[in-house]
């Protein structure tokens, strides 16, 4: 996949209709947005286009709508964006997304003005990458901008289809930043390159482990998936999470790491509990073995130090997935220590979206990282070495 894509700064947008695919898939409670990260992430691109005289048309999906659904309207987003930008963002209420109301709102736009279209998933064709809806979207635009990394792994009308019917398709600042940090970390890292993988399941990360073993100097494994690896090494794991059908795969990966000269770090002690509950008593094991009747819920203190030391020696660190059940106070220290080591490091530190992004922000280390990816599934596919259709579809430099 080529990372050298044209950006909004490579095109003259003055007087042009610019359709921007944003990621406004935000959590709503009673019509109020409860997490504004994604809105804030979109502001630099919107401001640039508006300040340079573009007629700005924003679009996005919200939730899993399968047709018009008043509970999934983007109206609250238009209202909040207006407040954040300090200028009106008109809302084109339109169940067909590109109906008469939307066309009229776009036709009336003056240079620098902004309108937000209704949820693209109000059209069931959106997810089918259907030509007719793609053409409808393209008919509103002279220039198309994709700034939604979170949906770049999906070939939908608003991310891929539309690019077939416009001549100019470029990326916004958010995607440019993702390509710069995630792209260079994976394709051209400053070494030593350390990747940290956590989360519950080996099966979710199989392709990531496979791909990263070709690229990293050190691979660190924590979280629920570590217990399948410990089992593969012959340790007892008590009642810990185990994917029995992945033990052989874990053995293969341990052998592959050895053959490639990659340091594979696994827990050397664990913090365990009798039950999966926030108030279960936390017990630290002597070594990697977990006694019968207990389940691993976090990496132990020796492991925390081992992992933190590996991070301290790195020049590039990519992290995807927590080290333990960080939602439980007693079992959050492993995740906290890894985040702290990354925050204190002068390496390029990239957080690969999803749970790790939530953990890092929750622990207050967000602003100490070089880059926090805005895509969960998209970052994972990126780390797997897959092409992302929404990025492939943009013009190369």
From Swiss-Prot:
It is found in: Cytoplasm. Its EC number is 2.7.2.3. It holds the Pfam family PGK. Substrate binds at residues 23-25, 38, 61-64, 121, 154. ATP binds at residues 205, 296, 327, 353-356. Belongs to the phosphoglycerate kinase family. This is Phosphoglycerate kinase. It comes from Clostridium acetobutylicum (strain ATCC 824 / DSM 792 / JCM 1419 / IAM 19013 / LMG 5710 / NBRC 13948 / NRRL B-527 / VKM B-1787 / 2291 / W). The gene is pgk.
């Amino acid at each position: 996949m080529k990372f050298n894509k044209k950006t909004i700064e490579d095109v003259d947008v003055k007087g042009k209709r610019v359709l921007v695919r944003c990621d406004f898939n935000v959590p709503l409670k009673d019509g109020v947005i409860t997490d504004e990260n994604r809105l804030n992430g979109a502001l630099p691109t919107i401001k640039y286009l508006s300040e340079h005289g573009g007629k700005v048309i924003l679009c996005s999906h919200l939730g899993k709508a399968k047709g018009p659904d008043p509970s999934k309207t983007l109206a609250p987003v238009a209202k909040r964006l207006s407040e954040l930008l300090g200028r009106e963002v008109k809302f084109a209420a339109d169940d067909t997304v590109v109906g008469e109301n939307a066309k009229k709102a776009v036709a009336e736009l003056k240079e620098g003005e902004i309108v937000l279209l209704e949820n693209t998933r109000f059209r069931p064709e959106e997810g089918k990458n259907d030509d007719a809806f793609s053409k409808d979207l393209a008919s509103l635009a002279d220039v198309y901008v994709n700034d939604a990394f979170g949906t770049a792994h999906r070939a939908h009308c608003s991310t891929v289809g539309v690019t077939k019917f416009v001549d100019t398709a470029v990326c916004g600042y958010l995607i440019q930043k993702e390509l710069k940090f995630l792209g260079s970390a994976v394709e051209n890292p400053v070494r030593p390159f350390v990747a940290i993988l956590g989360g519950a399941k080996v099966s979710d990360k199989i392709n990531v482990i496979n791909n990263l073993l070709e690229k990293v100097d050190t691979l660190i494994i924590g979280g629920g998936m570590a217990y399948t690896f410990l089992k593969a090494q012959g340790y007892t794991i008590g009642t810990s999470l185990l994917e029995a059908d992945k033990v052989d795969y874990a053995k293969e990966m341990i052998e592959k790491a050895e053959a490639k000269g990659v340091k594979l770090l696994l827990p050397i002690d664990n913090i365990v509990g009798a039950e999966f509950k926030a108030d279960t008593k936390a017990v630290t094991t002597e070594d990697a073995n977990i006694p019968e009747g207990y389940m691993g819920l976090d990496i132990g203190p020796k492991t925390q130090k081992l992992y933190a030391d590996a991070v301290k020696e790195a020049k590039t660190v990519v992290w995807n997935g927590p080290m333990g059940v960080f939602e439980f106070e007693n079992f959050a220290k492993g995740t906290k220590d890894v985040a702290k080591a990354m925050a204190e490091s002068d390496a390029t530190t990239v957080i690969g979206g999803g749970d790790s992004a939530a953990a890092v922000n929750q622990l207050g280390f967000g602003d100490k990282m070089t880059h926090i990816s805005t895509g969960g599934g998209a970052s994972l596919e990126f780390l797997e070495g897959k092409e992302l259709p929404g990025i492939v579809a943009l013009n190369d430099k």
